[in-house]
Amino acid sequence: MSSQEIPANQYHHHMQIDWMDFVTSDNITPATEANLVERAVIVGRVGIMMLACGTGSWRVRNSMNIVAQTLGMTCSADIGLVSIEYTCMDNHRSCTQALSLPSTGVNTTRLNALERFMKDMEAEGVSWTIGEIHARLNEIQKSKGNYQPWMVGLAAALACSAFVFLLGGGLVEMLCCFIGAGFGNYVRRKMIDHHMTLFACIAVAVATACIAYLVSFMSVRALFNVSPRHEAGYIGAMLFIIPGFPFITSGLDLSKLDMRSGLERGAYAIIIITVATLVGWLVAMLVHLRPEDFMPLPLSPLMYLLLRLPASFCGVFGFSIMFNSKLKMATTAGLIGAVANTLRLELVDLGHMPAGAAAFLGALTAGLLASIVRKKVGYPRISITIPSIVIMVPGLYMYRAVYNIGLTSISTGALWMTRALLIVVFLPLGLIAARILTDKKWRHNG
């Protein structure tokens, strides 16, 4: 058997679809005159490509509806985290298909390209042929990531070092987090590129981040004789794994009664949190790390305010790069996040506001600012709003909850879990409120 031949019993667990197998019409006839199956496949392909970008079910369904309406059909879709079942109807005929993805992720650059495609199709799609539509989608689908693994590692390093400062850490914690998160996310990206399973990627990345933090901290301590209390910053090194995107989109989907998608996204986020925190706890037990309070920093309230602005920007910018945002998009999200997250922290520190209420106002601010900015830059709302509030997701609280529960300190663990839950619930509520106020299409059902 030649090296080019593949045995009949070898195949991908999730088989790839050759979309051109469905094309039977010529490349001259407008797509609106193609048969039902050809048009329905276009609807499904757009939907599954949108879903692969990590966006919520409302946006996926809206895109499928635009394509269906442009091609003269009615579409009804049931959308989950990694699968779509949909039916297209036209002239007393119907075509039902089920499509699925092997995994899920976030790609804001591809999402932006698909949004532009949708606008073009809505305006002039009636004159396109089936072949032209597939060619445009092929071009979008074949687009590669904007950043190499080492770049994504640096983005996580920047984000987590800024994150740990916002949590109360100092220069030692920031330096060690930079190293730990950088190595951890680099390893995670390499494993993802090799199509490793979800649990393995999470476990190895978190363990690598914690161990890299410990090694760098021991080196700093040996060179500069710093306090052992700085070891508490190891939590910050693993915060790149926190699934802020599915957490927030879960709440958005539930608000639109897309129960399947909302619950699946919530379950996916909980799985990641559970595996990451348990692995972090196991590593901490093995190498004797403890999540103590950070050492107080000798900074005035004004200095905190002035430093929180650039730290929040760097954190959001780094997370946006991890979501494959281009530099301009990441900068836009970073500027919004700098204002929204600094406002949240100042409301807690100076206004003595409960953390949940401050999270709501911070997310509301981010949503309102994004609504203003997107009219000028044209980016999808979700690609700048969610990255701008991911930094507000209380990964530290979640880890401390699991750490204490693991030590059977149930009351302390429950306290941290309650604090985390309140913030996690209020973050999507803030975005939902902003969306209701600024988006007429979102405001109404149907």
Which stretches of residues belong to each language-model region?
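Soluble N-terminal domains of membrane-associated systems
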Residues: 1-134, 139
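Alpha-helical transmembrane segments and immediately membrane-proximal extracytoplasmic
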Residues: 73, 89-111, 120-127, 142-153, ...
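Core alpha-helical transmembrane segments of integral membrane proteins
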Residues: 145-249, 323, 327
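Hydrophobic, membrane-inserted alpha-helices
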Residues: 155-163, 181-188, 208-209, 311-319, ...
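Structural signature of hydrophobic alpha-helical transmembrane segments
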Residues: 164-180, 229-243, 295-311, 352-365, ...
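Membrane-interface helix termini and inter-helical loops of multi-pass transporters
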Residues: 219-229, 287-301, 404-415
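C-terminal transmembrane helix-loop-helix hairpin of multi-pass membrane proteins
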Residues: 233-238, 249-253, 257-272, 305-307, ...
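Generic multipass alpha-helical transmembrane bundles of integral membrane proteins
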Residues: 240-248, 268-352
